[in-house]
Regions:
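Conserved NTP-binding catalytic cores of kinases and kinase-like/nucleotidyltransferase enzymes
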Residues: 1-72, 169, 188-194, 283-285
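An alpha-helical support segment within catalytic cores of ATP-dependent transferases
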Residues: 2-9, 117-178, 188, 270-284
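Short, surface-exposed acidic
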Residues: 14-18, 150-154, 233-241
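Helix-rich C-terminal or lid/interface subdomains of diverse kinases
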Residues: 103, 213, 221, 228-285
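Active-site Asp-x-Gly
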Residues: 175, 188-229, 235
């Protein structure tokens, strides 16, 4: 593919062969063989995806572990090939039920959040923030696109929107990963450490968004291990997230051509537990 050869030329990498790992939504990922070495090159055709290049640089500057970046251009990253690493392996589905892995990834998230508070306070004004999607306009669009206009929960939410949004704006922000799943995880072969990679959705937010994101994918036992290692979270953030995350996730789902399966449970929740979550939020206000 032309884009791969163009970026490799910029990087000064001779390519003996390559195989495409991903080619979707303007992001092309390929494994490159150059002599006796193997790399992974990630090429970005859209500006909104190019922020991942800067996000790698940001995490390195903060001392948050990432996979190794060999080189970069303004449109591509040349990364170590984890499949050839003597130390690490890519995450597997079984990791989601492994308490040891749960503990190790908690260490990474705790470091990300602790280092992120200061950075966001000083330099995070323009960072991606999923909470920006919590608007009355987006709520109206969700109702229309999902045909859920008659759900009583929407009335209760709109009545309390101003107070909830005020608390949301005041919530302390840190760097948040926003994209947890085993396919985005790297684990040490001896399980001594673990880290996340793929940083396109990295942004700012309150820390509990990541905690919820991780716990939703881990088994109960692995989740308990994660929380034991991560430590306490702010219960007000949880109450806030219980409401805001439903709107944000449904908004993102409604941007798809077809409504995704992973958002169906939240749509069903509009007529069940969502009202209870809003009522709980009202008690916090």
């Amino acid at each position: 593919m032309n884009i791969i050869h163009e970026e490799l030329n910029k990087l000064g990498i001779a390519c003996d062969s390559f195989s495409i790992l991903q080619d979707k939504d303007g992001v092309t990922v390929a494994r490159i063989v150059s002599g006796e070495k193997s790399y992974v090159v990630k090429c970005f055709q859209k500006d909104e995806h190019k922020r991942e290049i800067g996000n790698y640089q940001l995490l390195v500057s903060l001392g948050v572990p990432t996979i190794r970046v060999i080189a970069s251009t303004d449109s591509a990253l040349l990364l170590e090939d984890i499949d050839c690493s003597p130390t690490y392996r890519l995450g597997i589905e079984e990791d989601m039920s492994d308490p040891e892995v749960g503990r190790r990834i908690a260490v990474w998230y705790k470091l990300l959040h602790s280092r992120g508070y200061g950075y966001v306070c000083q330099s995070g004004e323009s960072m991606y923030d999923e909470a920006d999607f919590f608007t009355l306009e987006n709520i109206a669009c969700i109702k229309e696109k999902t045909g859920s206009q008659d759900a009583p929960a929407w009335v209760l939410l709109e009545q309390n929107y101003a107070a909830i949004n005020e608390l949301l704006c005041k919530a302390r922000r840190t760097i948040t990963y926003n994209d947890f799943y085993y396919t985005n995880m790297v684990v040490a072969k001896d399980k001594s450490s673990a880290l996340m990679f793929v940083y396109n959705l990295l942004g700012k937010g309150y820390a509990y968004t990541d905690v919820r994101n991780v716990l939703s994918s881990l088994s109960e036992e692995a989740g308990k291990a994660f929380l034991d290692e991560y430590g306490e979270f702010d219960p007000i953030e949880k109450a806030l997230d219980d409401v805001v995350s439903v709107v944000v996730t449904l908004h993102l789902a409604c941007q798809r051509d077809e409504f995704p399966w992973w958002a169906q449970a939240l749509l069903d929740e509009l007529n069940t537990t969502f009202i209870e979550k809003i009522e709980n939020m009202r008690r916090v206000l």
